[in-house]
Amino acid sequence: FCFVFRHLGGSARYIDDPDDFLFSLANKVNVKPLKLAHRRIAGRSHSIYTHYNYGPTFGGGHDLHISNHANSNSHSHTHLGHTYKAPPGQQANIFLAGTHHFVPSEVEAFYLVTKN
């Protein structure tokens, strides 16, 4: 799961969101629900990657990438560690889904809508 304060979509580019985070309510390794920290690196703003032919993609190394038409292929993947930290003692590429590449049955992305 992810929580962002910016709208997803548009041309191919990275977007920085200083308040974003990934979180896990349930996972294959039975770690209790937690929020995954965003590693802030000077000069790198890689919270979210947008591309017209991609699904939601988070982190500079595509830490969590949901492919286009994700329920019909195994191109979605997780590779934590570039922007978002895996919990101590957990393998970065399998923590969220139990395997590096996966076919999601459901995807939820949340963002905050504010009224001016």
Residue ranges of model-derived segments:
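Phosphate-recognition beta-domain surfaces
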Residues: 1-116
